[in-house]
Amino acid sequence: MGTRRRKRKKEIAGLPSYLVLLVLLLVWLFQELRPGPSAQEPPLEAGEVQVYFMPQDGERAKARLLALMGGAQESLYGAFYEFRDLEIAKGLLEAKARGVRVELYGESDYRKDFRRYLVAASLGQTQEPPRVPQAALRERVRPTSIDCEEIAGIPVCFDEREGFMHHKFLVVDQKAVWTGSTNMTWNAFARNNENSLLLPSPTLAQGYAQEFRALFGGQKEGLGEPVAFRLEDPLVEGTAYFSPKGGKAAREALLEVVRQAQKEVLVAAFVLTDRELVEALVEAQRRGVAVKVLLETRNLRDSREEDLLQAGVPVRQDGNPYTLHHKVLVVDGERVVTGSYNFSARAWQVNNENLLVLQSPALAERYRKEVLRLWEEGKPL
């Protein structure tokens, strides 16, 4: 008569199967819920944050930008929407002549301007606007691919997309970033209401450099990876977002800043057509937040100022006979939103843009004073 063997539940390393499953579940939860690299607090970096408001700071701002170019030792990566300034063109060419790696990425609508200004500067011209002989253009512009060419020795690529390549940033030696609303044009520095920031953060600069390299290398929508950074003078904690690849994250960050407002939201905007942003501003007004919106006069027809006015939100058109080109929100005297990112659907869906969300009472106070100054100069609707 054979011995009957008792069936036993499967065990691993002496553990019952249900305990094994429990251990595996806990390991999976740990992997899923633990903070990833993006959630880690970025290092606090030394360096002075500098902010410039045009036109009053225009000469100082351009001098600082040219000094950055003049002090560059390794690389200058510039993503520029418009390019019409001989001094800036000269600064880039001089850096190139010193052996600095200079690369530019531009909006294809302004390809002729990139050619004209870089070639004119290479010829030693200083008078605006430059006059460049066609023979010089033929001699000093060399196509290298469908989207790229070498202009006066500087490699320049263009986006060639439906959306705008709307950036206005320069990465210096992958150690600092110059960015904001200011195009590389004489008008932007001398006439328009603009803002530019110099952020000496290697962490941020490397993130911008990666976005630039992707664009320059043919990834037309960019990487879209947000970059968190911290600077100590004054203390700034911020995140940079890039669209269109990271456009949804950029827009959600923008909306969340408004939704979290408790006391005050100040807006200075070239255009305001994003319906959800308008709704968030209206909702802020309804819950007792003091909202003020200043808009560029020529874009009033395209903006949604009527929705704001009907909800009781004070709205003014700007008083500058040239252009109010800001894309700025100041919230509760503590947070600033700025960058190249217009408050429109195209900014997060189609265009190449960068958006900065900054936590800094000191920086917010400077932006707040500027927006309120422009508000006083504006005209009520």
Regions found by a protein language model. Give the residues of each.
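Charge-patterned, long linear interaction tracts outside catalytic cores
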Residues: R373-L381
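N-terminal Lys/Arg-rich, disordered targeting/topogenic segments
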Residues: M1-A13
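HKD-type phospholipase D/PLD-like phosphodiesterase module
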Residues: E32-Q73, E82-Q260, R275, R287-R335, ...
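Hydrophobic membrane-insertion alpha-helices, especially the h-region
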Residues: S17-Q31
